[in-house]
């Protein structure tokens, strides 16, 4: 490592460490005093460091914000409970597992629902503290866990839901699982607290523990990884810290991976030191070196990532601080080999194929559209029960997609009719879903997310309904615009890779971004700030009218907005995301 590289990448060391670094150092490898808090009947939540530590175990403490003021008036603490996010690399789950998870959701969660996420897993919302060990022991019995699905670790690893290319998908999925396992923390703290219920008696009990990859203070910030199979970019690969783009050998077999790093979509309103950015190309590696590449990127981020300012701690800021060439050189040094040149690849879209598709192996796959990923029995719909009934007879597997949908995968020809009958009976197959709605997404936001500034999941259905009317008015109902709503600027709804992105600013108010593309490779530009949903619809009515009248053949809304100068493209986010006047095209020889 050269002095120049080290100095450039580690300037943050001159400042005090964030308190999260103390917390991790003193946590006894993530155990803290969580077991003591579990025994405390006076509060539904966790105290002190434990409030943060449970995140490393895949949970967030939340409360029902709809009734927070009411409970405060009654001199009661907020109705506290936990969100749990399962670790499920590639989103594949067995029907037998689903049946048990459904039972837990109905009997033990406040909202009696299962939420499919755009990180290809499921979440329980509203789990009381008294049921947490029961929940984790159930996951353990089912061969599942929730370790490292939150906090400063490598989160759930995504993999393109591509059952048509069955062999290539199988190989890519195996690497998604291997990467997930390789980058897991080695501490027994998760098992000790949630499964065994064993309290560490002295420091001797954990002196033998080690974290050879993550280190005893783990990563500076969250770290997201995805495996993607072009031409489908369903996992939004440009929004992750680390991406493995599968390259086919031309015969349906895996030739290796293009490695990208430095994507991320969170920011802070008004803080120009924060910005979303797309991931950048490092190079190509053959399959046998994929784990080595993953470890090298993670340890480079571990050692160079900012541990003083958490708002500038993600991998994209590390690359910006070091410079891409220096970052790549450091990764290659740790790999012990250079990257090969990037192999050509291209994305053509990222939406799921709703309905039946046949794989090359002869099996059928039914993709069910699940709006915002929420499976619940309410409002005359029995979506949760519908999936349960399918699980009781399904002989294949389920695949949760990064678009918050559910694939009933590997269905034999003889079983198709019964599966479809159940799906239609319970409203899992609908004939009234527009292309616009199929390509819309939201985060959870109110009432459970403590960071929510504005509604997202609860307003999406009606907002898309109004947008559908505008599309019909301008004769574009057979087309779609990738539209996403997120309740705050932390990026969970991936609005910063949408053609139309709404980012919550305050209750009932949003920033409107436009100019992303259908393939998910361009960040949208801020168009209007701090406006209401009716105002947004009025703006979009005008813009969609212009798009309908002046678009080129097959030109998406975002591309049209850029071509016609409605907004300037975000070309280099660290430079021009906050200042469009600096969006100057890079001259190429």
From Swiss-Prot:
Coiled-coil residues: none
Record Gene3D superfamilies: Sulfite Reductase Hemoprotein, domain 1
Residues binding siroheme: 492
BP GO annotations: cysteine biosynthetic process; hydrogen sulfide biosynthetic process; sulfate assimilation
Cross-referenced InterPro entries: CysI, NiRdtase/SiRdtase_haem-b_fer, Nit/Sulf_reduc_fer-like_dom_sf, NO2/SO3_Rdtase_4Fe4S_dom, NO2/SO3_Rdtase_4Fe4S_prot, NO2/SO3_Rdtase_4Fe4S_sf, NO2/SO3_Rdtase_FeS/sirohaem_BS
Enzyme class: oxidoreductase
Residues noted as binding [4Fe-4S] cluster in the record, renumbered to the chain: 443, 449, 488, 492
Cofactor: siroheme; [4Fe-4S] cluster
Pfam families: NIR_SIR, NIR_SIR_ferr
PROSITE patterns per the UniProt record, alphabetical: NIR_SIR
Its EC number(s): 1.8.1.2
The protein, known as: Sulfite reductase [NADPH] hemoprotein beta-component
Lineage of producing organism: Bacteria, Pseudomonadati, Pseudomonadota, Betaproteobacteria, Neisseriales
Gene name per UniProt: cysI
């Amino acid at each position: 490592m050269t002095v120049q590289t080290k100095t450039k990448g580690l300037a943050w060391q001159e400042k005090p460490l964030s308190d999260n670094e103390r917390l991790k150092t003193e946590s006894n490898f993530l155990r803290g005093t969580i077991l003591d808090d579990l025994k405390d009947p006076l509060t539904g939540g966790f105290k002190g460091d434990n409030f943060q530590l449970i995140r490393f175990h895949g949970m967030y403490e939340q409360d029902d914000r709809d009734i927070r003021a009411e409970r405060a008036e009654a001199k009661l603490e907020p109705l506290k409970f936990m969100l749990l996010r399962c670790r499920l690399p590639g989103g594949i789950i067995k029907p037998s597992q689903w049946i048990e998870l459904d039972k837990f959701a109905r009997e033990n969660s406040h909202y009696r629902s299962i939420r499919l996420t755009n990180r290809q897993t499921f979440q329980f919302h509203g789990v009381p503290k008294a049921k947490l060990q029961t929940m984790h022991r159930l996951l353990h019995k089912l061969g599942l866990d929730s370790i490292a699905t939150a906090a400063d670790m490598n989160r759930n690893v995504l993999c393109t839901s591509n059952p048509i290319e069955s062999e290539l998908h199988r190989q890519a999925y195996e690497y998604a699982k291997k990467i997930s396992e390789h980058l897991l923390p080695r501490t027994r703290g998760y098992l000790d607290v949630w499964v065994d219920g064993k309290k560490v008696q002295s420091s001797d009990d954990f002196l033998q523990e080690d974290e050879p990859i993550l280190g005893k203070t783990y990563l500076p910030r969250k770290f997201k990884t995805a495996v993607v199979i072009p031409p489908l970019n369903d996992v939004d690969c440009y929004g992750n810290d680390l991406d493995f783009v599968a390259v086919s050998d031309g015969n349906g077999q895996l030739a290796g991976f293009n490695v990208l790093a430095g994507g991320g979509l969170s920011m802070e309103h008004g803080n120009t030191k924060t910005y979303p950015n797309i991931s950048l190309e490092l190079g190509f590696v053959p399959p046998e070196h994929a784990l080595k590449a993953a470890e090298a990127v993670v340890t480079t981020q571990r050692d160079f990532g900012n541990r003083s300012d958490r708002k500038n701690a993600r991998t994209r800021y590390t690359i910006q601080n070091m410079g891409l060439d220096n970052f790549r050189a450091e990764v290659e040094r740790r790999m012990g080999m250079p990257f090969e040149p990037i192999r050509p690849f291209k994305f053509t879209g990222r939406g799921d194929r709703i309905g039946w598709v046949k794989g090359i192996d002869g099996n059928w796959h039914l993709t069910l559209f699940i709006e915002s990923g929420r499976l619940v029995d309410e409002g005359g719909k029995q979506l949760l029960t519908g999936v349960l009934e399918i699980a009781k007879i399904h002989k294949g597997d389920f695949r949760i997609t990064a678009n918050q949908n559910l694939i009933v995968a590997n269905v034999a020809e003889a079983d198709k009719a019964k599966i479809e009958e159940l799906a239609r009976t319970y409203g899992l197959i609908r004939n009234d879903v527009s292309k616009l709605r199929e390509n819309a997404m939201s985060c959870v936001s109110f009432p459970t997310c403590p960071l929510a500034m504005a509604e997202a999941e609860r307003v999406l259905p009606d907002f898309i309904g109004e947008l559908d009317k505008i599309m019909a008015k301008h004769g574009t109902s057979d087309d779609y615009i990738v539209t996403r709503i997120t309740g705050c600027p932390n990026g969970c709804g991936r609005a910063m890779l949408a053609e139309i992105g709404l980012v919550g600013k305050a209750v009932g108010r949003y920033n409107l971004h436009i100019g992303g593309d259908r393939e998910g490779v361009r960040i949208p530009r801020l168009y209007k700030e701090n406006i209401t949903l009716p105002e947004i619809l009025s703006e979009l009515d005008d813009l969609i009218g212009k798009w309908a009248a002046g678009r080129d053949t097959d030109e998406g809304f975002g591309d049209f907005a850029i071509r016609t100068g409605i907004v300037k493209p975000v070309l280099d986010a660290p430079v021009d995301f906050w200042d469009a006047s600096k969006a100057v095209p890079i001259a190429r020889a």
